[in-house]
Amino acid sequence: MSGKFLIFGATGSIGSSLAEQMNNAGYDNVHLVSRNQDEVEAIASKYGFSFTVADVLEQGYTEKIKVDLEDALGIAYCIGSIDLKPFKMVTENDFNKCMKLNLYSAIEAIKAYQEALKKNKGSVVLFSTAAVHRGFTNHSIIASAKAAVEGLAISLAAEFAPNIRVNCIAPSLTNSKIAQPMLKNTAIAEGIAKAHPLKRIGEGKDSASLAKFLLTNESSWITGQVIAVDGGRSKLA
């Protein structure tokens, strides 16, 4: 089989952890996508993976990726953002940019490889957030965008069955570059950790281990699910 597993956001906390776990599990057919050339090149070189430098916010970005990879076994769209503002300060552009990053570009990726995924009975893994299921102040932008991602995942799971599985992971706050503005403050970080029943901040590997399971045939009888990886935050806190 010539196809590969695509990891979008491969230099982020979850994406890079997923690349590591796929390598550790013996998968060498992985293609990484990131806008950060030096970082993605280093990760790809470390594991012997192929890669494309591409920015998902650019028009027609999938064409650049398809030059490097035509055939896909699965897609993990490990891209997210933390857009926090009081609602009275939120602009239409804030919503548009967040929707483009989290929803529209994921749609473009799936459409670009839909036929390959169908042929290979592949899998799509999308990412949401715990903020969709538990109200947090200042989260209207990202919660709205990720709620749309969940709707997309469930709808496509129904439409694509039985040939393509589609699932969604909903993490709580994860230790990552985009979370550092909050986590660099020790008191804030400790407060956030205590708000979770499991009393810690998530790590990239927490969501990545589930992503690996959902991306591969280990989860061949699972589709249309939104699964929380949130230390119990959405249900128990």
Task: Show which residues each predicted segment covers.
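N-terminal Rossmann NAD(P)H-binding glycine-rich loop of SDR-like oxidoreductase domains
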Residues: T11, A19
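Substrate-binding pocket helix/loop in short-chain dehydrogenase/reductase
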Residues: P86-F87, T91-M99, A189-I192
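Alpha-helical segment proximal to the catalytic Tyr-Lys
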Residues: E115, A157-P162, S220
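Catalytic loop of short-chain dehydrogenase/reductase
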Residues: S123-A148, A153-A161, L173-T174
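Short C-terminal tail/terminal secondary-structure segment
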Residues: R134, K212, T223-A237
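Short, flexible catalytic-loop segment of classical short-chain dehydrogenase/reductase
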Residues: V166, A170-P181
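A conserved structural motif in NAD(P)-dependent oxidoreductases
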Residues: H196-S207
